[in-house]
Amino acid sequence: MFVPSYDVAGFIGNGYFMRDILYAEQLINELQNDEFSYPETVYMVNKVSQDFLIRPMGIFQLVDYVGIDVVQFIMSVMQPHVEKENIQSELIDIHLNNAVKGGQFADGTQKDGFFRYEKGKIEAIFDPGKKRYISVSEVSEKCDEYLGPLPEGWLPWKKLVHRPDKDELLKKYFSQLLASNSPGTVMAKSYLQRFKEIGSDLVKNKVAFKFDDVNAVLIYGFHHAYGPVNDYF
């Protein structure tokens, strides 16, 4: 699929992706202010962005997949062309300063990044303060309890994305999410609001021609089940 856009650094895809990373970093800082450890915050933000938002990957797993060094490079290319906005991530820089780069091996398996992987599954979280990986099992129980259960009607991305009744299922799911006030759903709602703002700003700031183009890049390029401009929320 061909999606046109204005000739702007980052275009639609990276224009969205880099800002999504920066918002995830903002959430991490807020959670650390609430006295959660760094590995706990990474676990929770990644879980909310994948499970509660029904995406194929959590935000930090996606950064690992692309490569932390690649993300830093994209941000450095975009920054001189973006006015009144800081496209730089201290979180990305800290990991690279610790020689943690993510990316993939030649056979497609995942290199260590924000997470360490075992047979494709997240097994541990890098803690820059301790300069080592912390097992997911050390943080998952506390974090899952804090976030609370997924809203009624939830389906994992893999089971939802190709369903012919996907639109109706998403409407019902987000109706349940919006009615909930657990910490996980509150975080998800703020994430969705920022998601929508990013998509709208890409049109407002003349990166994308129209909202449908932003949605197309997210759905067909990032394989999301829905775009940022929709009637679900």
Question: Where are these predicted regions, by residue range?
Answer:
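N-terminal glycine-rich phosphate-binding loop for ADP-containing cofactors
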Residues: 1-233
